[in-house]
Amino acid sequence: MAGAKEIRSKIASVQNTQKITKAMEMVAASKMRKTQDRMAASRPYAETMRKVIGHLALGNLEYKHPYLEERDIKRVGYLVVSTDRGLCGGLNINLFKKLLTEMKEWNQKGVDIDLALIGSKAVSFFGSVGGNVVAQVTGMGDNPSLSELIGPVKVMLQAYDEGRLDRLYVVSNKFINTMSQEPQVIQLLPLPKADDAELKRKSWDYLYEPDPKALLDTLLRRYVESQVYQGVVENLASEQAARMVAMKAATDNGGNLIKELQLVYNKARQASITQELTEIVSGAAAV
């Protein structure tokens, strides 16, 4: 009956693991609702900022800000948003695959790449595969603030201001729904022009007070910060959704494994009982 005891021990072990994954699924579901609320609250601001900036890029401005001017591309920068924790399916690896594909294309063109990493998974990944990491931040938790992101953003903006970067992107996961999260690469600088057909049919002119330079310097930096923050918030919602789905799958798989082990255990127990009965009958016949 040693085999049956071993199987019974495995069943107990899987049941304990199943309890853990079920608890993690419930925690992730609760956190996902909170992050969705935060994402929904910040999204209108980020989208409005994007529209305003799109108007500016199309407009005939009396002051041409450096962030609006295209440059010859010699070096690009990526702000990479990942998670701090794992157990969220292929969320991070899908993001890294998309980024590596883009990096390979730039390398083939002879363009250098700088990376600013947000999240310990990105730090760990690019520590292994290599990359020119110029800034990083980890441990922001479930309630990230803009002040925690200022460091990497400031490093990349300073490099762009000094002409060491010619293009800047943010890479993160876009939350579509609970079952679907999509890696995305968004160009931050130079400012992309609005691609909405209705906006392109209109001409945009603005009056600036007190003066265009002071206003645009502040507005355009706020735009970059808002897009990075929105990327972090959406990535966090994607993380919790992916973790909830992954833990549910693990719980379901645990249930299936328990059923299989229970069947094996019953067969082993039946074989053991049959053997004992055979031995008893054989002993009685010998007497």
UniProtKB/Swiss-Prot annotation:
One Gene Ontology MF term: proton-transporting ATP synthase activity, rotational mechanism
CDD domains per record: F1-ATPase_gamma
GO biological process: proton motive force-driven plasma membrane ATP synthesis
Listed GO CC annotations: plasma membrane; proton-transporting ATP synthase complex
The UniProt record lists the keyword Ion transport: yes
InterPro entries membership: ATP_synth_F1_ATPase_gsu, ATP_synth_F1_gsu, ATP_synth_F1_gsu_CS
Primary localization: membrane
Keywords associated with the record: ATP synthesis, Cell inner membrane, Cell membrane, CF(1), Hydrogen ion transport, Ion transport, Membrane, Transport
Superkingdom of source: Bacteria
Pfam families hit by this protein: ATP-synt (PF00231)
Localization: Cell inner membrane
Membrane topology qualifier: Peripheral membrane protein
SUPFAM superfamilies, alphabetized: ATP synthase (F1-ATPase), gamma subunit
Quaternary organization: F-type ATPases have 2 components, CF(1) - the catalytic core - and CF(0) - the membrane proton channel. CF(1) has five subunits: alpha(3), beta(3), gamma(1), delta(1), epsilon(1). CF(0) has three main subunits: a, b and c.
UniProt family annotation: Belongs to the ATPase gamma chain family.
Record function comment: Produces ATP from ADP in the presence of a proton gradient across the membrane. The gamma chain is believed to be important in regulating ATPase activity and the flow of protons through the CF(0) complex.
Protein name per the record: ATP synthase gamma chain
Species whose genome carries this gene: Edwardsiella ictaluri (strain 93-146)
